[in-house]
């Protein structure tokens, strides 16, 4: 395996570059998935039936906390990748751990939000609006949950094998995935929550 030391570690082999390119293609498919879910939501968001609408169930404070946690995690994962590129394994792992803890905090708030909805009688079966909303939020939440366990697995590999072209490639691809989830959340925050609160 030929290593090009003039490139960042995650790009240093032809195989690594192909894996990163392949992951961008995968993210394209993920964009299609979330675009479909957003389209369904925008089509059904006025069909509340006898259930509540967004303005009646959305609470701004928890949503702001969720946004703060995810956007901060995007910053810390970026710091982790920077630390990886300069060969600082401890700092890289520390920033990745902080990222995952922030993601865990986000999930905790989201689970509490879903529990609150259910206690208020707003379930996936109540209306088309709630069905579309919970499918969109749930899909994003499942992606964050998967990302958490994926990040833990990468940290375990870096801890046992150190930073090498393979582990750096995996960590970088994970960071792309995490940034993607943050971008999706910005759209959810802007076009689902804020739009729902002011409509």
For the regions a language model picked out, list residue spans one by one.
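...captures the hydrophobic TM-helix bundle architecture rather than a specific catalytic motif
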Residues: 1-199
């Amino acid at each position: 395996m030929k290593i090009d030391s003039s490139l960042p570690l995650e790009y240093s082999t032809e195989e690594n570059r192909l894996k990163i390119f392949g992951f961008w293609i995968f993210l394209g498919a993920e964009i299609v998935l979330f675009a479909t879910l957003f389209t369904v939501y925008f089509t059904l968001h006025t069909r509340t039936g006898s259930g509540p609408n967004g303005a009646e169930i959305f609470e701004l404070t928890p949503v702001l906390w969720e946004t703060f946690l995810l956007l901060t995690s995007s910053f810390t994962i970026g710091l982790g990748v920077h630390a990886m590129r300069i060969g600082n394994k401890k700092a890289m792992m520390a920033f990745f751990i902080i990222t995952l803890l922030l993601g865990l905090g986000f999930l905790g708030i989201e689970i509490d939000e879903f529990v609150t909805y259910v206690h208020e009688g707003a379930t996936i079966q109540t209306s088309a609006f709630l069905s579309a909303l919970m499918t969109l939020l749930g899909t994003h939440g499942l992606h964050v949950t998967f990302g958490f366990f994926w990040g833990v697995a990468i940290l375990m590999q870096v801890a046992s094998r150190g930073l090498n072209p393979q582990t750096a490639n995996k960590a970088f691809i994970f960071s792309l995935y995490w940034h993607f989830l943050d971008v999706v959340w910005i759209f959810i925050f802007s076009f689902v929550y804020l739009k729902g609160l002011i409509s």
